[in-house]
Amino acid sequence: MNNFNLHTPTRILFGKGAIAGLREQIPHDARVLITYGGGSVKKTGVLDQVLDALKGMDVLEFGGIEPNPAYETLMNAVKLVREQKVTFLLVVGGGSVLDGTKFIAAAANYPENIDPWHILQTGGKEIKSAIPMGCVLTLPATGSESNAGAVISRKTTGDKQAFHSAHVQPVFAVLDPVYTYTLPPRQVANGVVDAFVHTVEQYVTKPVDAKIQDRFAEGILLTLIEDGPKALKEPENYDVRANVMWAATQALNGLIGAGVPQDWATHMLGHELTAMHGLDHAQTLAIVLPALWNEKRDTKRAKLLQYAERVWNITEGSDDERIDAAIAATRNFFEQLGVPTHLSDYGLDGSSIPALLKKLEEHGMTQLGENHDITLDVSRRIYEAAR
């Protein structure tokens, strides 16, 4: 096991009716800006519940944050925060609203003579402070409710980049599985795929004898395999929804990634697909992951074989046959959830691969993976294999 420094300060209020504890998490004299997405939180009544919980407090609203939150939209919120002297941000939504609000939190406190896109260009390394934020989660997927990372898109340039800063980690997160009952099937399936790939990005790398992290990761994967399809078939099954919600949080709150090598190349290649073609984040992960594993099967051999045996119970055949079977089982799982796994399934013929590689190079993504050996040429082969 490698050395690590783990700090997970987000308070989790989990369960049915957990919103009852919301008010006491926010300073009583705060000027609160509630952020949300396209308006589903209004239709479902979640926003009304939040407003009721904060009755009598100084509250403003900012809606319209997109899936793959756009810098251009977020800068309008930054302007509002600065003008209205907002002191606390409250997310009501999923990972996109969370990521966007993390940017708002950091950008509002960023030096006014510097374009806040600099936050993305520097990966968040120069963030000195941020407006504190909390979350009422409505979509389990990204784990953004209890981590310090975010991914932001810039429409005008076709960029999608990530940043990380302890200053933007949510102070608390309210996780009520009931809020997920009304999610569209596509979002449920995407969330399961997202959590699954988050887990394997930290697990299917190379062995460092990190038994606890490995078995935590395997537990998350087995839970998603068992309950992901059930969440689609039984949308109001509380226990299923609770397990999927908690799995997504655990997949990316730092615990399973502590002291182990991490990959993240699937995400980096996927980000370029989203930025260029507008695919859902989880769709890009489902496209890239099987192709990447096949390409990197030799360097990932030990962990792919462990994954095959412990997650899919694949024990028969040669090493290569078991790896093939594990990759096929993973692809089949995504397909059964309704998330196709080839570029051609989305009407893409691969003609944009040179442009995708150019963007990877522009963003410095030329030595990806746990071994930093996924060069542009390897990325090209992965994209080609994903057609």
Describe these PLM feature segments.
Residues 10, 110-209, 306:
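A glycine/threonine-rich phosphate-anchoring loop and its flanking beta-alpha core
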Residues 86-102, 138-144, 276-279:
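Glycine/serine-rich anion-binding loops at beta->alpha junctions
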Residues 311-387:
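C-terminal charged capping/lid subdomain of soluble metabolic enzymes
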Residues 77-78, 97-111, 146-149:
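Short Gly/Thr/Asp-enriched flexible loops that form oxyanion-binding sites at enzyme active sites
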Residues 196-200, 241-252, 289, 330, ...:
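Short alpha-helical scaffolding segments that buttress acidic/His motifs in well-ordered protein cores
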